[in-house]
Amino acid sequence: MKNRAQYFSQHLCEFLKTPPQHISDITNLPLLFYNLITSYNVPKLIHEGNGLYSAASADITLKKLDEANRGSYGVLYYCNVNGKYYYLKANKEPNVSLKNEAFLQLGAHIILSYYNMPWAVPSVHHIVDIPDYDVCFTMDIVTDMKTFGRHMMEHMKWNTKCIENDVLVMELLCQLALYIMILEKDLGMNHRDLKLNNVLMVKQEPLVNHTIEIDGLSYQLNSSARAVLIDFGFACIGDLETRGSLLSASEYGIVVDMCPKAGRDMFLILANMWNVPAVRGSLTAKAAGLFKKWLVDNTGKNWSSWLAVNRDPELKSVYNAINHENFLGVNSTPAKILEDIRGSYEGVFSLHLF
């Protein structure tokens, strides 16, 4: 099996249509990633009329179809490219490039695929410059899915503090913690907007004793549904040696917001869950105790208590806190969350040496 740097470089160069890089297993993969993508020339498409775009030089014919979904910043359309169907993501505002976001999502997909989790992030297939839309990108269509918020609404036993509710939440957190641990460790990446609506659940594809091997450890997952991480519109990568930011999908907060930042992503999804009174009221004392432990930052502030008292529906206070240059999620690092769940919920997650 290729080492992770060779695997990552090969698949990225295939996308870029550049000669493969012959490299050893280096530790500073984010810098390699950044250097490979900075010189990429995005193909410019010509509008042929009626939503049809083409570029002879890039051998692309793209037909924009119906709108699939609309978020705060982006719009998803269905599209057909050379006879295959994808999502096409564009910014809601004209002349806003999604080039950085596209590459960050592509990089996340490649590295998680190396660890036997190709479903974890939808693959990016084309990055193109479309008239009136600027740089957009196509990606895999995720079928038979629901956001995790909707998944909880349909499967939680509300207002009943039971182990079944705990397990549903812990299954998701284990998957996300593994994704984030890999992205931070290998790509120096933070998602920076990890919340309930940016996680899709595919119930038709459960995980049964699914094994992921990372640096001499074998992680085994069991879950009633697979988690898919989406929307890299605020993601960033940083140099693992200097800790300096290299690339951001958004300029928001990047001047002081170092990347990666320990515990940041998992802290946000935990706060997003705990901020919902119905969720707090449907977890057992054991699960609540873990949330209270995880939601303490490096200043000693207990955000579980703060969120239970203060109404913050958009989590503005939490975003402000985690984007501060000195923030650390001391108890919400992926490794600590995985260890706590392994010790508290037998069968959801296990860890072995190999």
PLM feature segments, named:
Residues 158-192, 196-197, 205-206:
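Conserved kinase catalytic-core helix
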